[in-house]
Amino acid sequence: MQSTKKAIEITESNFAAATTGYDAVDDLLHYHERGNGIQINGKDSFSNEQAGLFITRENQTWNGYKVFGQPVKLTFSFPDYKFSSTNVAGDTGLSKFSAEQQQQAKLSLQSWADVANITFTEVAAGQKANITFGNYSQDRPGHYDYGTQAYAFLPNTIWQGQDLGGQTWYNVNQSNVKHPATEDYGRQTFTHEIGHALGLSHPGDYNAGEGNPTYRDVTYAEDTRQFSLMSYWSETNTGGDNGGHYAAAPLLDDIAAIQHLYGANLSTRTGDTVYGFNSNTGRDFLSTTSNSQKVIFAAWDAGGNDTFDFSGYTANQRINLNEKSFSDVGGLKGNVSIAAGVTIENAIGGSGNDVIVGNAANNVLKGGAGNDVLFGGGGADELWGGAGKDIFVFSAASDSAPGASDWIRDFQKGIDKIDLSFFNKEAQSSDFIHFVDHFSGAAGEALLSYNASNNVTDLSVNIGGHQAPDFLVKIVGQVDVATDFIV
């Protein structure tokens, strides 16, 4: 029997985005499509939900074995190891976390608490704690260990009668462990090991020091650092590009995993939150102040009217506001995603040629400078092209219904364009959309009506062949039928 699975081989050309109109929107809407029987790089593709379950396949939580979705209160500490010469693995040269390490570890803990119902409380070094942090410098035979990075134990790990759950250990010979920073591998290491201490496994059955595993050994295609910081493998295997930077906080599949274990934190960022430039998140990894400062994150947001502000970047960007989607931001690829169940309402592009795709909410999309492509999707959207030759794309009557119409706020006659080509494509007719002086009730009729008193043009279209138009866009400015449409 012939396989029904869709096979995709990741190459550079897979992610060469279309640059104009509907094709650019369609490319972005299908960017990093996953699950549903797809195979990528010869491996089964897992959905976000499947990946989250696989990362938690050991079924260990601090609430007990297979006790899922329940909140938890945990303690943590930074022991001084004054009276300990060897840890449980036989490593020596033990030392207390420095002030810098402690600060970065607390930020990593905070990033997990942001997305799940976990409360962390610090206790004194000598007190028993659920999660502990410590450095080592020599391996079991007594050699200075420059090969390993760190390791940790899942909850309820019992070895030779000892409960090792929650212990996390770090090789202080590694400079990024000794001096971790936001975009450095050290910060990711802290967040990764805390993930283990909370109950997360690697996305595949591998561990450092056990053989020589590679991406070819993965269980599913999305086992990369584009989808999970619990992964060992580069984001480039799935077409991402973090530009040599590393995530500091849980990524898309990590959020699904940790919320499966402890439930979602529905008190995180419930107000009107801005991510990127002009950020009010109070989180370093969700904020940037310059074109050279890149962001790598998965957005978890519990409410409010929220904005992706990537206005300070000069590279061409592709911004998708749909849940479980990926965006290319600040010259990187697939470096920003949105967790399941999250609605981000607004997006601001930079000075490059951007593609911005909205969702079913009432979006405000601003292209900024450059030749941008804007697609609001459902909802009553406000579209601002900004300077440059911009294209406003529509693909369904529901994108801009008369009762909830979109507004194009800054249309430039003879420069910008309105793309209705998908309606012709769907009707399999090159002239389905045709402009008329009045409606007769025939499907595909389009009419422009300009009101000079308020400088607003109504674009009405009868998509379904009803008695009245079922599609209406309000446009500030005049529109020329001959030059301003793509059909």
Curated annotation (Swiss-Prot):
InterPro entries: Hemolysin-typ_Ca-bd_CS, Hemolysn_Ca-bd, MetalloPept_cat_dom_sf, Pept_M10_metallopeptidase, Pept_M10B, Peptidase_M10B_C, Peptidase_Metallo, Serralysin-like. It catalyses: Preferential cleavage of bonds with hydrophobic residues in P1'. Keywords: Calcium, Hydrolase, Metal-binding, Metalloprotease, Protease, Repeat, Secreted, Zinc, Zymogen. Hemolysin-type calcium-binding repeats lie at residues 348-365, 366-383. Ca(2+) 3 binds at G350, G352, D354, G367, A369, D372. Ca(2+) 6 binds at G377, G379, D381, D399, D406. Its EC number is 3.4.24.40. Ca(2+) 2 binds at G304, D306, T343, E345. Ca(2+) 1 binds at R269, G271, T273, D301, G303, D306. Its cofactor is Ca(2+); Zn(2+). Ca(2+) 4 binds at N359, A361, N363, G376, G378, D381. GO terms for cellular component: extracellular matrix; extracellular space. Belongs to the peptidase M10B family. This is Serralysin.
